[in-house]
Regions:
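Nucleotide/phosphate-binding catalytic cleft detector across ATP-hydrolyzing
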Residues: 1-157, 176-191, 203, 210-309
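Conserved blade-register residue in beta-propeller folds
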Residues: 16, 169-171
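Ser/Thr-glycine-rich phosphate-binding loops at phosphate-binding pockets of nucleotides
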Residues: 162-168
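A contiguous pocket-lining binding segment that forms or flanks enzyme active sites
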Residues: 199
Length: 309
């Protein structure tokens, strides 16, 4: 029996139903690196997964980076579920609605390769994975399968998926995506964090890491002066204002329509919204793995429909 594994291939992080790790990948060629944490051995080469982040590339299929990160994600998810390292997998992945039709065939072929099973080693454990199927679903909308009640309670709502590089917007009317309203803003968390880092450097001379800035933005523990925290919070509010303004300019009236915010940036916006923004209603899905869970449920639903037909 095959296992369904949902994978959200973000610019900032790779997410499965139970795991999330940075989307960075460092190649060490044929030389084994100093660490086993995140260590992937594939095709006679060594890679460390989860260090830093991917350079922005519009087409994720231009090199093998996201394929290698997919193998790491499968290994992590299998281990988390307590499953054997030799198994068959059905991948449920996603793409933004703005590029869904164009990129879907190529992304499926990229993940579903002819050489099966795929043999590799991750963190010292040997895996033999047969990828039987790759199904691709719209990001954001698939995540709403984890909160079905949201679609039943409102005739219209705005879906805002705040990812690493883009914020993908789409209106949903009577539980059906209004595909002609799909819009993408290049205002994701990478842009937010980079702008804050630069502002902190200008005002204090300090160079903070992504991890430090992310924790401060999320209100999580992180050693740092009050001056730095003030800058981070001020810039977090500035980012939120910019995002709301850009969304309104894209034709979505946030004073009139409820908005569902999800993705890695949703927690930042949730902490920096103000009553003076006058938004109609905001609903936050703060688990950054919600898209991956939604992909799994979508594929399971499709499979049930086929078996019942």
């Amino acid at each position: 029996m095959s296992i369904i594994i949902g994978i959200d291939h973000g610019y900032y992080a790779i997410k499965t139903a139970h795991c999330s790790f940075p989307a960075g990948l460092t190649s060490y060629g044929e030389h084994e690196p100093y660490t086993r944490q995140g260590l992937l051995e594939f095709g006679g080469c060594f890679f460390v997964c989860g260090t830093g982040r991917q350079p922005i590339q519009r087409d994720k299929t231009v090199n093998d980076n996201y394929y290698l990160l997919t193998l790491a994600a499968i290994a992590k998810e299998i281990r988390q579920r307590g499953l054997p390292p030799e198994c068959s997998v059905r991948i449920a992945a996603g793409l933004p609605l703005t590029s869904f039709g164009r990129d879907k065939p190529k992304f499926k072929d990229y993940l579903l390769r002819s050489n099966q099973p795929v043999n590799y080693k991750f963190e010292g454990v040997e895996y033999s994975i047969t990828i039987e199927e790759v199904a691709v679903f719209p990001q954001g909308y698939a995540a709403l399968m984890t909160e079905v009640g949201l679609l039943q309670d409102e005739p219209s709502m705005l879906l805002m998926d705040l990812g690493g590089w883009t914020v993908d917007l789409m209106r949903i009317d009577n539980a059906i995506p209004a595909a002609d309203t799909a819009h993408s803003l290049e205002l994701g968390m990478i842009r937010c964090v980079d702008d804050i880092r630069e502002q902190v450097r200008r005002e204090t001379g300090l160079s903070l890491t992504d991890a430090q800035l992310e924790n401060m933005l999320a209100g999580q523990p992180c050693t740092g002066s009050e001056a730095v925290r003030d800058i981070v919070n001020r810039q977090g509010r500035k980012y939120t204002e910019h995002l709301l303004s850009a969304t309104m300019e894209a034709g979505f009236d946030l004073h009139a329509i409820p908005a569902v915010l999800l993705g890695g940036g949703a927690s930042v916006v949730s902490r920096h919204l103000s009553p003076k923004d006058g938004l109609c209603k905001t609903i936050f899905l703060l688990d950054d793995k919600v898209n991956a869970v939604g992909f799994e449920r979508a594929l399971a639903a499709v499979s049930r429909s086929k078996s019942e037909a």
